[in-house]
Amino acid sequence: MKVKITGTGSCLPKLRVTNDDLGQIMETSDEWIRSRTGIIARHIAVEETTTGMSTEAADKALKNAEISAEDVDIIIAATVSADKHLPGLACEVQKNIGAENAVAFDINAACSGFLFALDTAALYLEHGGYQHALVIGAETLSKMMDWTDRSTCVLFGDGAGAAVLSASKEDGILSMVQGSDGFRGDVLNCMARKVNNPYKKSDKALSYVSMNGQEVYRFAVKTVPKAVTDAVEQAGLHLEEIDLFLLHQANYRIIEAVSKRLGQPMEKFPTNLEECGNISAASVPILLDNVNNHGMMRKGMKIVLAGFGAGLTWGATVINW
């Protein structure tokens, strides 16, 4: 059985926070942030929740795919910032949209999460027995930030994106490449919650996201081009035949470096990090929905989706739109 993406949706919080806004609460400036990252603004959840944004993105994706919640057989949500430790985000969305026939579970692969979830859903559908999958990437990273650390908090935003995968007679998912390197995981991490156990003393304080930016950059510019190249080759294509490269929106410099190493023009690399920042697992599906809504994709186009981030993890998928 073949699999195609048949619908997309996304949701961003109402509050738009510019670099100048951040300059009012910390030692930073628009010039400092923009020159290093390409980010101009990001959206921060105030009243919104990971679950609420995921539900809205899911509803939009189902509408775009022209199916009902009852048609969904499986829901996979990728997140590192669910509202609850349990039940999982996918189960919360299942309840909210009324997908009573679906099996639902979460995946945590940080910024690569949506790619891992997408590929997992595709394998379920290819195996048979399932017709439609709802895949979600969603984050409220603002609650995980140290808002006194300008090297990290200025990079991230909140939001949710979703895609519907459907069993098809046409080629849709052409190839999938994934990888992990736990040996270098400390370059981007966030420690677990404090231990609450009367039999074990804990000296851990609350933890926030910490990152070695230079190491993450080196990892990304080396690993992503190889993953993309491998995925394109597995699909039986050449890089020149790819119409669009939708990369995780971490940093404009990283995207430029990947473009250069692949020998492909930046015109093939649409971005939204200028207005969204880095939204981890939500980054790729939100960009996919933006590109879809702006009419940039036509039937038969070959598109690469690629994610990379904490773990370290990475993934690349080639799709036939």
Residue ranges with predicted function:
Residues M1-D20, L118-R184, L288-W321:
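Conserved beta-strand-centric core segments of catalytic alpha/beta enzyme folds
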Residues M1-E47, D149-R218, K222, K226:
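Condensing-enzyme catalytic core mediating Claisen C-C bond formation in acyl metabolism
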Residues I5, I33, E70-A78, F105-N108, ...:
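Beta-strand segments within the central parallel beta-sheet cores of soluble alpha/beta enzyme folds
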Residues I5-G7, E47-N108, L115, A231, ...:
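Conserved beta-ketoacyl condensing-enzyme motif
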Residues I5-G7, I33, A61, I75, ...:
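Conserved small-residue
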Residues L22-Q24, A82-E92, H132-C153, G179-Y199, ...:
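Active-site-adjacent elements of ketosynthase-type condensing enzymes
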Residues W32-R36, I40-G52, T79-A133, K260-L288:
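Conserved catalytic cysteine-centered active-site region
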Residues D203-L273:
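A contiguous, well-structured pocket-lining segment that forms one wall/lid of small-molecule binding clefts
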